């Protein structure tokens, strides 16, 4: 290992000379305390290093030792239910080692627990030919996650020895005879974070990732293996949307990256997730979650690493055949870290001071999402769905981070400050948001939920757009100038907004809505419209239609529990009978 010498320190950036044997992206130990850093630029024998820990106390002349390895993560049993910092140091072990509630400098802790024994059950046998990605056994990591142990990349040969029993992550579980000699396999493997894990082939995403949030699932769905952006100003509810998708999203593994956001928000996740039950398994949500906390007061450089660490862990579970979602909150803070490092490197700035390579770095991250066939004999299919929050200053979505993100992702959930001020949550603006997966997801919904799902969605969306146009007229000449048909449209659109799109994240029945319940709710609201139009044609006054008692039941249908969905069919029957009664009375009276 070559030792260099520091010649300059500028915040998280350290420049060292005598580093001619090092490579870009090598990990180095900086100073007497051995702070972890990564080389981001080489000029002759001078290396520019971004340090992932606080650099106070380091000065020129201090040593820099290269490890000769890129920044890598340890992948194996013990990831689920863990909380790491940006460079995969477990925070609980960190606290014990540092004996402090705050991050101390130069503390070395292993990413995965070396003492804990895991029960390994082999699925391969001696004599089997194996190559990269083949599953050789399993470990029941939590009640929900079966951890498949795969042959690491670069290993191909015949199994010479394989053992069942309890092992820690460093003990040998199998020996593979390769052309270059015997290779020992353990429960753990390492992977460089900046390099995407290989797969056999990419697939077209065709299935929606349901979230239980009506505005998302019905109007702007994201596919399993898709990418979505959630831009919005402060206080618009980005973090709650991310939490809701993490809690109720239809994925088997959740990787939640808190990147440069408030520490309290990560505390919320830690407090809430263990108590919440997964609707599919009945187990705690924490039993399928990996948390990476890189809060706003932690070193800036580690924000970049935290995003890559998160996506690498997500790809690892994808290779096992799982559907994984990764939440990054917020990519703007990561971009700000890039801007700070770029400024200290004295690079030519791009828009608003961000580096010229901002777009390509964002693309590197989002392009690692997708649905794939993993390497290995059994053709496992896995998916990584990436959902990134963006925090544009002042809610201005024309700024570089939002624009670069929108060029890459296919789903845009635009949060609106005006809706948030009106206490309309989730404050996703239905007129500016979009999903490019809509057509494919509509086909899936028509086949699996109800054959008129797409038709109902199109009708509801058209009503909301008509409402926006009619509101202009109402502002100018008042409601009285509208025809009864137009007034009915406004009332139904209001019902869609307040009774369907608005959702209470803290109400036990309203926080999550199944696709079946979503269909029945939307069908109820639009059935009211169709029945009301018949009544108006029969000569019934609109005021009478709007005063029907069944309207209250339609509005409160969102609070019906999933077990009592059949009550909605009763409301539909009641709606039709009340309307028919009005028509039989009103039609005669007004004839």
From Swiss-Prot:
It comes from the Bacteria. ATP binds at residues 232-239. Its EC number is 7.1.2.2. The keyword Nucleotide-binding applies. One of its GO terms (cellular component) is proton-transporting ATP synthase complex. InterPro entries: ATP-synt_VA_C, ATP-synth_a_Xtn, ATP_synth_asu-like_sf, ATPase_a/bsu_AS, ATPase_F1/V1/A1_a/bsu_N, ATPase_F1/V1/A1_a/bsu_N_sf, ATPase_F1/V1/A1_a/bsu_nucl-bd, ATPase_F1/V1_b/a_C. SUPFAM superfamilies: C-terminal domain of alpha and beta subunits of F1 ATP synthase, N-terminal domain of alpha and beta subunits of F1 ATP synthase, P-loop containing nucleoside triphosphate hydrolases. One of its GO terms (molecular function) is ATP binding. It is an enzyme of class 7 (translocase). Transmembrane segments: none annotated. GO terms for biological process: proton motive force-driven plasma membrane ATP synthesis. The keyword Membrane does not apply. Keywords: ATP synthesis, ATP-binding, Hydrogen ion transport, Ion transport, Nucleotide-binding, Translocase, Transport. It catalyses: ATP + H2O + 4 H(+)(in) = ADP + phosphate + 5 H(+)(out). Produces ATP from ADP in the presence of a proton gradient across the membrane. The V-type alpha chain is a catalytic subunit. PANTHER family: H(+)-TRANSPORTING TWO-SECTOR ATPASE, V-TYPE PROTON ATPASE CATALYTIC SUBUNIT A. Belongs to the ATPase alpha/beta chains family. This is V-type ATP synthase alpha chain. It comes from Clostridium perfringens (strain SM101 / Type A). The lineage of its organism: Bacteria, Bacillati, Bacillota, Clostridia, Eubacteriales.
């Amino acid at each position: 290992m070559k030792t260099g010498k520091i010649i300059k320190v500028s915040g998280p950036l350290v420049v060292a000379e005598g580093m001619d044997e090092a490579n870009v992206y090598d990990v180095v130990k900086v100073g007497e305390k051995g702070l972890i850093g990564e080389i981001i630029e080489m000029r002759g024998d001078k290396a520019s290093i971004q340090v992932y820990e606080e650099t106070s106390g380091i000065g020129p002349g201090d040593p820099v030792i290269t490890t000769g390895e890129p920044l890598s993560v340890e992948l194996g049993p013990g990831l689920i239910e863990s909380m790491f910092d940006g460079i995969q140091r477990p925070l609980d072990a960190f606290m014990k080692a540092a004996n402090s509630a705050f991050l101390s400098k130069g503390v070395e802790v292993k990413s995965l627990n070396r003492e804990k024994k895991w029960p390994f059950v082999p699925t391969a046998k001696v004599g089997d030919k194996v190559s990269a990605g083949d599953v050789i056994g399993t470990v029941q990591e939590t009640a929900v996650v079966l951890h498949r142990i795969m042959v690491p990349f670069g290993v191909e040969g015949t199994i010479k020895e394989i053992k069942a029993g309890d092992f820690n992550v460093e003990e040998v579980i199998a020996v593979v005879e390769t052309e270059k000699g015997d290779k020992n396999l353990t429960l753990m493997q390492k992977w460089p974070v900046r390099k995407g894990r290989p797969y056999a082939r990419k697939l077209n995403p065709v299935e929606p990732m349901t979230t239980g949030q009506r505005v998302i699932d019905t109007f702007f769905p994201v596919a399993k293996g898709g990418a979505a952006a959630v831009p919005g100003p402060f206080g618009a509810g980005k973090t709650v949307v991310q939490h809701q998708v993490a809690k109720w999203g239809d994925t088997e593994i959740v990787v939640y990256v808190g990147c440069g956001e408030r520490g309290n928000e990560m505390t919320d996740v830690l407090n809430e997730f263990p108590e919440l039950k997964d609707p599919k398994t009945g187990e705690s949500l924490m039993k399928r979650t990996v948390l990476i906390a890189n809060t706003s007061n932690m070193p800036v450089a580690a924000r970049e690493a935290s995003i890559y660490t998160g996506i690498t862990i997500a790809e690892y579970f994808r290779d096992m055949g799982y559907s994984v979602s990764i939440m990054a909150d917020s990519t703007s803070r990561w971009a700000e870290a890039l801007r700070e490092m770029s400024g200290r490197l004295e690079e030519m700035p791009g828009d608003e001071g961000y580096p010229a390579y901002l777009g390509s770095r964002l693309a590197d991250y989002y392009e690692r999402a997708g649905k794939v066939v993993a390497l290995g004999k059994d053709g496992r299919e896995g998916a990584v769905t990436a959902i990134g929050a963006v925090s544009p200053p002042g809610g201005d979505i024309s700024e570089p981070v939002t624009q670069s993100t929108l060029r890459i992702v296919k789903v845009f959930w635009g949060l609106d400050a005006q809706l948030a001020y009106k206490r309309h949550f989730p404050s996703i603006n239905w007129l500016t948001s979009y999903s490019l997966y809509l057509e494919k997801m509509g086909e899936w919904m028509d086949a699996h939920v109800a054959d008129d799902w797409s038709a109902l969605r199109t009708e509801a969306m058209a009503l909301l757009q008509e409402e926006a146009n009619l509101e202009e007229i109402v502002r100018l000449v008042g409601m009285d100038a509208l025809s009864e048909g137009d007034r009915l449209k406004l009332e139904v659109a209001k019902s869609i907004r307040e009774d369907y799109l608005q959702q209470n994240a803290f109400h036990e029945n309203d926080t999550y809505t199944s696709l079946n319940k979503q269909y029945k709710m939307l069908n109820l609201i639009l059935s009211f419209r169709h029945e009301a139009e018949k009544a108006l044609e029969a000569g019934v006054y609109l005021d009478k239609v709007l005063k029907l008692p069944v309207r209250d039941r339609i509005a409160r249908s969102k609070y019906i529990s999933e077990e009592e969905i059949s009550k909605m069919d009763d409301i539909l029957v009641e709606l039709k009978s009340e309307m028919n009664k009005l028509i039989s009375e009103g039609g005669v009276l007004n004839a």
